[in-house]
UniProtKB/Swiss-Prot annotation:
Pathway entry: Amino-acid biosynthesis; L-threonine biosynthesis; L-threonine from L-aspartate: step 4/5
Record's catalysed reaction(s): L-homoserine + ATP = O-phospho-L-homoserine + ADP + H(+)
PROSITE patterns (UniProt xref): GHMP_KINASES_ATP (PS00627)
Protein family membership: Belongs to the GHMP kinase family. Homoserine kinase subfamily.
GO molecular function, one term: homoserine kinase activity
Protein name (record): Homoserine kinase
Source organism per UniProt: Clostridium beijerinckii (strain ATCC 51743 / NCIMB 8052) (Clostridium acetobutylicum)
Residues that bind ATP: 83-93
GO cellular component, one term: cytoplasm
Compartments in which it is found: Cytoplasm
Any one GO biological process: threonine biosynthetic process
């Protein structure tokens, strides 16, 4: 069996809407095997055991690109630690996992760049799939039907705290509340802060993240779909967070804190309990590897 491990991702980082994303050390593992015929699923709810399965669709996309007719396919979800519809890239783990698994079956026919192009074609934007495939913090754009990206050498000194609500928020639902157009003022607001944010991660001047992480494109609109958002967001800053932003389409709030801060998570847990919010807190770090093969036998 071919086993692929894919990291969670936090996209739409601050002002970097559809552009900035980071891979984190929380993983989904998928197993793949070519079989004599048919389509077999293991470890998944019955509703996903069909040809509409996003993992299968990504694999078929890759096989079709190669002109390969697969006899049969067995797909297993071995481990699912990335929560679904929480803004941590669960769908991207499926897309990237399927593409990487298919490429292994094909004998690594496609390059990493070609797999990224396929992932963006499927997903529609690069900010989740790029770090899921490549690891690290990635700045990516889509221009004239091609993806261009670069990885940021993130300086040490920080850790990421995922503050995960106990309810789902679909990307489709979160997209509906966004405005069709933005003002020049908001455009300048985000562009300037996105530039500063990249500089902060590159230089390690994390004291500036608080100002760089602000957004005018999506957070104000989507936060209204998340009961308790404002309270938790403001409390995170009060407790010493260097930066806070809505992860992906939400509902997870991502706090960036000093790596030496030992009190933030416990203090925030106390606050959530007082407020009656049954949210989960996960301390995470940067994953630089991206999607990896942890077992490679067909």
């Amino acid at each position: 069996m071919i086993t692929v491990r894919v990291p969670a991702t936090s996209a739409n980082m601050g002002p970097g809407f559809d552009t900035l994303g980071i891979a984190l050390n929380l993983y989904n593992d998928f197993g793949f095997r070519e079989i004599e015929d048919g389509l077999k699923f293991n470890g998944m709810p019955e509703e996903f055991c069909n040809e509409d399965n996003i993992i299968y669709k990504a694999m078929k996309y890759c096989f079709d690109k190669a002109g390969y007719k697969i006899k049969g396919l067995e797909i297993s979800e071995i481990k699912q630690d990335v929560p679904v519809s929480r803004g941590l890239g669960s769908s991207s783990t499926c897309i990237v996992g399927g593409l990487v698994g298919a490429n292994e079956i094909l004998g690594k026919k496609f390059s990493e760049e070609e797999l990224l192009e396929m992932a963006v074609e499927i997903e529609g934007h690069p900010d989740n799939v790029a770090p899921a495939l490549l690891g690290g913090m990635v700045v990516a754009i889509f221009d004239e039907n091609k993806t261009y990206y670069d990885k940021i050498d993130v300086k040490n000194g920080i850790k990421f705290i995922s503050i995960i609500p106990n309810f789902r928020l679909s990307t489709e639902e979160a997209r509906k509340v966004l405005p069709k157009e933005i003002s020049l003022k908001d455009g300048v607001y985000n562009v300037s802060r996105a530039a500063l944010m990249v500089a902060c991660f590159s230089s390690g001047k994390y004291e500036l993240l608080r100002y760089a992480c602000k957004d005018a494109f999506h957070q104000n609109y989507r936060s209204k779909l998340i009961p308790g958002f404002e309270e938790v967001y403001n409390k995170s800053y009060e407790l010493g967070a260097l930066a806070c932003y809505l992860s992906g389409a939400g509902p997870t709030i991502m706090a960036i804190i000093d790596e030496k801060d030992e009190r933030f998570s416990n203090k925030l847990k106390e606050f959530l309990q007082i407020k009656g919010l049954e949210w989960n807190i996960l301390g995470l770090s940067l994953d630089n590897a991206g999607a990896t093969i942890i077992e490679g036998t067909k």
